[in-house]
Regions:
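Exposed, flexible binding/inhibitory loops of compact, secreted disulfide-stabilized domains
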Residues: 17-151
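Bacterial Sec-dependent N-terminal signal peptides
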Residues: 1-26
Length: 151
C-alpha cells in the first residue's frame, strides 16, 4: 500500500514538473527595463535604426554619450552603472519618425538553445504630435552564452 502511494506521489510530482517553463519564466523575470521612450534630437544623436547587444562597459558608455549629445536622456534611466560580469544590455532603436506617438516594445524569452527578442514597433492611434522622435527601448538581461536572436 505504501509503495502504491509512493509511486502515485512520484508520478504526480514528475508530471507537474515544468522545468522548461520555469526556466523561461525565471529568465524573463531577469529582464530589467532601464528606459524606453523617444529621443527628441531629430536624429542629431547619430543613432540609426538598430538592435544592440552590449556586453562591455566601454560600449555602454559610448552609447550613453551619444544618447546625451542633444538632451540628457540618461537622467531618466533606472540605472546606468551596469555590472557587465552579470548582465548584458539590449538596446533597440527605431528610425527617426516625423511625428510622435511611436514606441518600441520588447518581449524577451530564453530558450534552451537561444534567447529570442521579439521587437514590436507601435504606431500612434489617431492624432500625434508634430515633432520628430526616435523610439527606443533599453533593458538589461542576465548574462548568457546563448546566442541572441532578434525577430
Amino acid at each position: 500500500m505504501i509503495n502504491k502511494i509512493f509511486s502515485v506521489l512520484i508520478i504526480f510530482l514528475a508530471l507537474n514538473c515544468k522545468s522548461t517553463e520555469n526556466q523561461a519564466k525565471m529568465a524573463n523575470e531577469a529582464v530589467v527595463l532601464i528606459a524606453k521612450g523617444n529621443l527628441y534630437g531629430a536624429g542629431a544623436e547619430g543613432i540609426k535604426k538598430q538592435h544592440l547587444v552590449i556586453k562591455e562597459r566601454q560600449d555602454w558608455n559610448n552609447l550613453i554619450t551619444k544618447l546625451n549629445s542633444v538632451n540628457n536622456v540618461s537622467n531618466g534611466f533606472t540605472e546606468t552603472a551596469i555590472d557587465f560580469s552579470k548582465y548584458t544590455v539590449i538596446a533597440v532603436f527605431d528610425e527617426v519618425k516625423t511625428s510622435g506617438g511611436y514606441s518600441v516594445e520588447l518581449d524577451i524569452a530564453s530558450h534552451s538553445d537561444k534567447t529570442v527578442i521579439k521587437v514590436t514597433q507601435n504606431s500612434p492611434d489617431g492624432m500625434a504630435t508634430a515633432v520628430m522622435t526616435q523610439p527606443y527601448y533599453i533593458a538589461k538581461v542576465s548574462k548568457t552564452n546563448l546566442p541572441i536572436e532578434f525577430q
